[in-house]
């Protein structure tokens, strides 16, 4: 049985209520993200904390709340969606986004080694850019939208933008 749930993954009470509503969980697929655009000089403390809260704290809260159910069964999968912006090369104008997604990669590695012997697998998916309405908005705000689109595509390992349905 596949069950999906949309909830504010930064809200401890809502996450606890969700955890209480499920008897068991086999897979946590955590796809949460907030993209702040710009360099360190463009990122004020409010955007910094929002990015940490949405991109990192939510993964901690969901994983730490649902992990005990998996540990009881001695099996489970935690899959965290990170980003190609977290890689060593980085991505231009993605200071805090890339930073938080890199933190998620460390988070996943630490959980993986801590719980693999308990039957829990932890992995990260690092997708490239997904062509969404917010992506179109961002590109259209560029000085040269056509060139911005080309630049985005050139940074993608697969030579194109990912589609939401993928």
Predicted regions and their residues:
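Active-site helix of classical SDR
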Residues: 63, 100, 108
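Alpha-helical segment proximal to the catalytic Tyr-Lys
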Residues: 68, 113-114
């Amino acid at each position: 049985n596949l069950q999906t749930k949309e909830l504010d993954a930064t809200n401890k009470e809502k996450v606890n209520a969700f955890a209480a509503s499920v008897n068991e969980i086999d897979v946590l697929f955590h796809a949460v993200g907030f993209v702040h655009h710009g360099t360190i000089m463009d990122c004020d403390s409010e955007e910094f904390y929002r990015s940490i809260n949405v991109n990192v704290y939510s993964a901690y809260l969901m994983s730490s709340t649902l992990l005990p159910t998996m540990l009881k069964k001695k099996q489970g999968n935690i899959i965290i969606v990170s980003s190609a912006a977290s890689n060593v090369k980085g991505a231009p104008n993605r200071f805090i986004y890339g930073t938080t997604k890199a933190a998620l990669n460390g988070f996943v590695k630490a959980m993986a080694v801590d719980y693999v012997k308990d039957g829990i697998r932890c992995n990260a998916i690092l997708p490239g850019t997904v062509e969404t309405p917010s992506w179109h908005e961002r590109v259209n705000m560029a000085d040269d939208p056509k060139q911005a689109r080309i630049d985005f595509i050139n940074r993608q390992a697969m030579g194109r933008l990912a589609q939401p349905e993928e």
